[in-house]
Regions:
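Short helix-boundary/capping micro-motifs
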Residues: 11-27
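A short LG(V/I)-centered, amphipathic sequence patch enriched
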Residues: 41-59
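Alpha-helical linker/hinge and terminal dimerization helices associated
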Residues: 43-44, 64-86, 92, 285
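Flexible hinge/capping segments at coil-to-helix
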Residues: 155-191
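Secondary-structure junction motif
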Residues: 186-210
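Hydrophobic hinge/microswitch elements
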Residues: 210-255
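A late-sequence structural motif
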Residues: 258-295
């Protein structure tokens, strides 16, 4: 029904956010990508793409991409019944936040992908935004902080990822000699994951009336590097439990507010119709989350 070249052009532009990056991925010219997307729009009789920076799908574009992805997964699963799986592997995508990937999801991926029959693309974004990748059709699942789903998707509560405001013992001795208060928190280096990250901002505002924009901030957009930066005394920030609970108990990390915490509720959103292999993957995610996350 749809020309494969036109279909891939649209999907890659949405996935990469630009015609230029899509062209590099498809190994064709930017003009060719533009022509293919435009031809598909003419064929459909509607606009499928918002040509902005980054490029985004229209509502009609989202519906089409979801439909195309569903067809792709169903075709792959069907062909796996007749062709050597080594030659024809199922590929799908999931959107997840960095802290979930680093703190509890990786064991699921390791177990599920052992067979070599499935190839996985992981889209990383803040937990408040991962659902957008699912809505746009780029992924078939998303770990997100949003409870509400859009049409044709279902949601299951995974639990809560708990965070504590912490720093290293050496950092504490240097910056918090006079206690943990508005002034000491404002003047000491604060670690922030990225511009979308509101964990520190919300915690400081709610507990100290302190706005993040008047703090001295380091931005470190990598979960493992962020955690190490706290451990090495570069700054203070929100640390996930239970991964770093032992560090707090052993006093390698100092809990700056023992009576306060931040719990981020996480949900798994997924397409209503899924293949047996994806159902198994979903069940493994739910089981692992409920072992690690707070109820």
């Amino acid at each position: 029904m749809f020309d494969p070249k036109k279909k891939m052009a649209l999907i890659e532009v949405v996935a990469s956010g630009s015609f230029e990056r899509a062209a590099r991925k498809l190994n064709i010219t930017t003009s060719a990508v533009s022509q293919r997307v435009r031809a598909l729009e003419v064929e459909m009789g509607m606009s499928l793409l918002i040509r902005d920076r980054p490029c985004r799908p229209t509502e009609e574009g989202k519906k089409l991409i979801r439909h195309l992805k569903n067809i792709e997964y169903l075709n792959n699963e069907f062909m796996n019944e007749f062709i050597d799986v080594k030659k024809n592997k199922l590929r799908f995508s999931i959107a997840v936040n960095n802290d979930s990937l680093s703190n509890w999801l990786m064991p699921v991926l390791a177990e599920y992908l052992q067979s070599g029959e499935v190839m996985l693309d992981v889209y990383i974004d803040d937990q408040d935004y991962t659902h957008l990748a699912l809505e746009s059709g780029l992924t078939i699942m998303a770990v997100t902080s949003k409870e509400k789903t859009f049409n044709s998707c279902k949601s299951v509560c995974l639990g809560k990822l708990r965070y504590k405001l912490a720093c290293s013992s050496t950092f504490y001795k240097k910056w918090f000699k006079n206690g943990v208060n508005f002034t000491s928190l404002k003047n000491s280096p604060l670690l922030v994951f990225c511009e979308k990250d509101r964990l520190q901002e919300d915690f400081l505002k709610n507990n100290f009336g302190l706005m993040q924009d008047i703090c001295s901030c380091h931005y470190i957009p990598s979960s493992e590097a962020y955690y190490e930066a706290v451990l090495f005394g570069i700054g203070y920030g929100m640390m996930p439990l239970p991964k770093y609970e032992e560090k707090i108990i052993s006093a390698d990390l100092i809990d700056l507010m023992p009576t306060e915490k931040t719990d981020i509720s996480l949900y798994l959103h997924y397409w209503e119709t899924q293949l047996p292999k994806l159902v198994k993957f979903r069940e493994q995610i739910i089981a692992q989350a409920r072992k690690v996350l707070v109820e």
